[in-house]
Amino acid sequence: MFYSLFFSTLPLFGLVFIGFISGKFDLLNKSDSKVFLKLVGLIIVPTLGIKIIGNFRYEFINWNLYFYYFLTQSIIYFLGFSIAKIIFKRQFSESIIIGMTSSFSNHLFFVYPIALFEFGPKDIVPIETIISVDFITVGLSVCALELASHKKINFGQIFLSQLKNPALIGLFLGLTIFFFQIHIPLSVNRLVNFICDAGTPCALIAMGILLSYQTDKTQIKLSLVITLLKIFIFPLIQFFILYLINYDLNISRTTMMVAAAPIGAMGLVFASIYNVTTDAVVRSGIISYVLALISICLLYTSPSPRDS
């Protein structure tokens, strides 16, 4: 399992390395990384809503299991935000990014492809549920970032600005296609797939570019906090909650794999769009990717405690 996961994720590290080398040799710079991340945030995220939410198998949703995941995600979000704000004295917007990064997993490009080959359709649905509902949680985080970016709070202006919120646009488009059973022509489907496939390369090359720049000790400490929360605390709290309520850990295995996955790209994407420091995010990305190779393998191969 480890070797399979390692070689399947090797191209991801390759993309980061390409960005890193490009940054070191001044082929690409921070401005270029912002263009890549803006492309992901404003174009690819809404398109992912069409692809994922529009084709979701809602009849198999396990809302109880998702609630326990969301509860854990909320705890980690709050911890990440509070540590950044209270202990490290970071600004409100940066604290939101730290909370987002600590609690959002790279489920779409890290766990989901593995699950497609290793699990049955019903076991994959919990991952699809998390991916779909994260459009709401990401959208709410973007609302908070928008609020933090205004010196004077004008709720009317903030409300209108949410008409351009990429996550909410993706959610709206996906739900519209699903509820009205809109048939998408093959040519449009191909366009959607082309756009979505660009997401990972753009985000990881941008991460590599930003990684090539030096940072301060505070950002390094924050990157370790994010990694600790995401790779260790998140799955431990998730396991504790499920074990405490006597939940079948075999049914929740894919959900646990998402909990142990590396950080997602949304924190980095919207940090760049809202001009928030990204140094801690990019460094925690590399560390969490390496550690997730071990954590996900352990969760996949470990027997359920209730089976022993």
Regions found by a protein language model. Name each.
Residues 1-305:
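Alpha-helical transmembrane segments of multi-pass small-molecule/ion transporters
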Residues 308:
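Extended, polar beta-sheet/loop recognition surfaces of beta-rich domains
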